[in-house]
Amino acid sequence: MPFFNRLASSAALALVLLVAAGCDPQRISELEEGLSTEVDVRDRFGPPDQVWDEGNGSRTLEYNRQPAGQRNYMITIGPDGKMSALRQVLTPENFARIQAGMGMDEVRRRLGKPAKVTPYALSGETHYDWRFLEPPNTAMLFTVVTDRSLRVLRTQTTPDMASPDHNGPR
């Protein structure tokens, strides 16, 4: 019976995450840059996973859809309290900006929280994975590899073999 309970709980969680991810386009369509306020954003998306102060009076609200989702949103609220930008940050263009030597704090701020973090004690490396969709609709993983000082060594992009959409051997 404990196995069945775990299975049922996992299925329920997966359904909730799937439904929540499916609501994002509706939530986004209800917001308008320059008019929507932080209250409007929080009413539609809930509390952010992280709030980043921008130094100019603006703040960026992080809405993370990892580990099950394939998008992360950064929504900027200007000093006037109005939304000035809404970006889905898990894109090939943003991945190309992640360079060797960059600190993990900067990577985290650009991409949001990763889906998975895997430390490798013997090599001293840590792998940070983000799930994303490569246009038009291919499930992929973007991996940032850091050293012990949390500096980027390299990045790589591979098919997301754990995705339910993957049709090859696992």
Predicted feature residues:
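Sec-dependent bacterial lipoprotein signal peptides
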Residues: 1-21
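Residues within mature, well-folded domains
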Residues: 23-170
